[in-house]
């Protein structure tokens, strides 16, 4: 089948929930992907910050193939070696003691909300405006963007939103029924919004003073994206609960709720569960992925390459009237422009660079952490060209 036929079949048989780019991808390697016509692209989107170790990493591919020949699924009625090995590894690299396995970031956030309510006996969850936590009914309600939740009313009760970065507003919002505060360390879908210095530490202190749990949604920031294994380490905070997914499995769908011992023990058999969560196949992929992150020092590389990427963007786009801001942490970068950025995405793709437009006016750049300097240079040249033409 050619691209035109595949696109037509998608329109005919698949529910139209996505606005897709008009290319059909075939394969990838490192930070490069190819479409079925043979065109190559520098991937600065990484499947929404998923392919952090690059496409088709041989160690992860081997782990997936090997595990598929042994045991793909068993359910959580039985023990498996791969699941406990991954749980032990996650507690070793995070500030947490116990793990619940899920299949996605939304599932992880659902689990975190349930755990917080069970542990505290309270119902209210405070989230930030402009946030994104998932598309299930609870997580889309926690999400601080009405465009995602309005079509699905009535929504679950017990959620409140305050401006991101405003500690005074957060303090005013905390009350007797507040179970938890859930925040992204850096808002991704909201436009790559970095919190003011000290904000997350102030929220942590506020939560502790009021016996409120702090949940950090590290679905997008986790596993090296910001220049540290977890963004909480970068900002010097220790949340009660952390949610992860995206980059965790190297492309295989897997997520997790990480929690401190005293909080985690609130869950009892039957309180929560998942048929596929923590299956041996996904756990094998995640173990291999995390080992690659550590062995190749990819968090440190993200810090170095992110600094280089930001510097090159600021150099090339200096004085460009269309650019309002260039910001980022590690390899999580946003270019805010004066106007809609969908046209920039199209123009960059036609010149061989894949990027994303979020929050309407922010070009989001989240490439694989293995991206090379020469690939960054090529991507910056393209972005400089298409943005300067605005």
Swiss-Prot record:
GO cellular component, one term: cytoplasm
Compartment(s): Cytoplasm
Note on cofactor: Binds 1 pyridoxal phosphate per subunit.
Cofactors required: pyridoxal 5'-phosphate
Keywords per UniProt: Amino-acid biosynthesis, Aminotransferase, Arginine biosynthesis, Cytoplasm, Pyridoxal phosphate, Transferase
CDD domains, per database record: OAT_like (cd00610)
EC number: 2.6.1.11
Pfam families linked to this entry: Aminotran_3
An MF annotation (GO) of this entry: pyridoxal phosphate binding
Residues binding pyridoxal 5'-phosphate, per UniProt: 105-106, 132, 217-220, 275
Top EC group: transferase
Transmembrane segments: none
Pathway field: Amino-acid biosynthesis; L-arginine biosynthesis; N(2)-acetyl-L-ornithine from L-glutamate: step 4/4
GO terms classed as biological process: L-arginine biosynthetic process
Main location, first listed in the record: cytoplasm
Post-translational modification N6-(pyridoxal phosphate)lysine, affected residues: 246
Binding locations of N(2)-acetyl-L-ornithine: 135, 274
Catalytic activity: N(2)-acetyl-L-ornithine + 2-oxoglutarate = N-acetyl-L-glutamate 5-semialdehyde + L-glutamate
Family classification: Belongs to the class-III pyridoxal-phosphate-dependent aminotransferase family. ArgD subfamily.
Subunit structure: Homodimer.
Additional facts recorded: May also have succinyldiaminopimelate aminotransferase activity, thus carrying out the corresponding step in lysine biosynthesis.
Record protein name field: Acetylornithine aminotransferase
Organism listed in the record: Methanothermobacter thermautotrophicus (strain ATCC 29096 / DSM 1053 / JCM 10044 / NBRC 100330 / Delta H) (Methanobacterium thermoautotrophicum)
Gene from which the chain derives: argD
């Amino acid at each position: 089948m050619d691209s035109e036929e595949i696109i037509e079949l998608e329109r005919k048989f698949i529910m139209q929930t996505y606005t897709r780019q008009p290319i059909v991808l075939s394969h990838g390697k490192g930070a490069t992907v190819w479409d079925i016509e043979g065109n190559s692209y520098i991937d600065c989107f990484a499947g929404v910050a998923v392919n952090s170790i690059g496409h088709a990493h041989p160690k992860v591919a081997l782990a997936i193939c090997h595990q598929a020949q042994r045991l793909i699924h068993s359910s959580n009625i039985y023990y498996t070696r791969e699941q406990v090995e991954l749980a032990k590894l996650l507690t070793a690299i995070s500030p947490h003691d116990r793990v619940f396995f899920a299949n996605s970031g939304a599932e992880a956030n659902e689990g975190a909300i349930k755990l917080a309510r069970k542990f505290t006996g309270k119902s209210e969850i405070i989230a930030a405006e402009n946030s994104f936590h998932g598309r299930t009914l609870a997580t889309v309600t926690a999400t601080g963007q009405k465009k995602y939740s309005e079509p699905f009313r009535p929504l679950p009760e017990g959620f409140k939103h305050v401006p991101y970065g405003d500690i005074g507003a957060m303090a005013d919002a905390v009350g007797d029924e507040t179970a938890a505060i859930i925040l992204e360390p850096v808002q991704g879908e909201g436009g790559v919004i970095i919190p003011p210095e000290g904000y997350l530490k102030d929220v942590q202190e506020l939560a502790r003073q009021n016996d409120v749990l702090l949940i950090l949604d590290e679905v997008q920031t986790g596993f090296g994206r910001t220049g540290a294994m977890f963004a909480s380490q970068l900002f010097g905070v220790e949340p009660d609960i952390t949610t992860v997914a995206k980059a965790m499995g190297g492309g295989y769908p897997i997520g997790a709720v990480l929690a401190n011992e005293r909080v985690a023990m609130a869950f009892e058999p039957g309180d929560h569960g998942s048929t596929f969560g923590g299956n041996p196949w996904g756990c094998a992929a995640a173990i291999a992925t995390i080992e690659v992150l550590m062995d190749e020092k990819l968090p440190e590389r993200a810090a170095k390459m992110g600094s280089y990427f930001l510097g090159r963007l600021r150099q090339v786009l200096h004085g460009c009237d269309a650019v309002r801001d260039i910001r980022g942490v590690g390899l999580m970068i946003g270019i805010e422009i004066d106007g809609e950025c969908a046209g920039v995405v199209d123009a960059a793709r036609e010149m061989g660079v894949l990027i994303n437009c979020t929050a309407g006016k922010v070009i989001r750049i989240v490439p694989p952490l293995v991206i090379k300097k020469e690939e960054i240079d090529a991507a910056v040249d393209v972005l400089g060209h298409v943005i300067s033409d605005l």
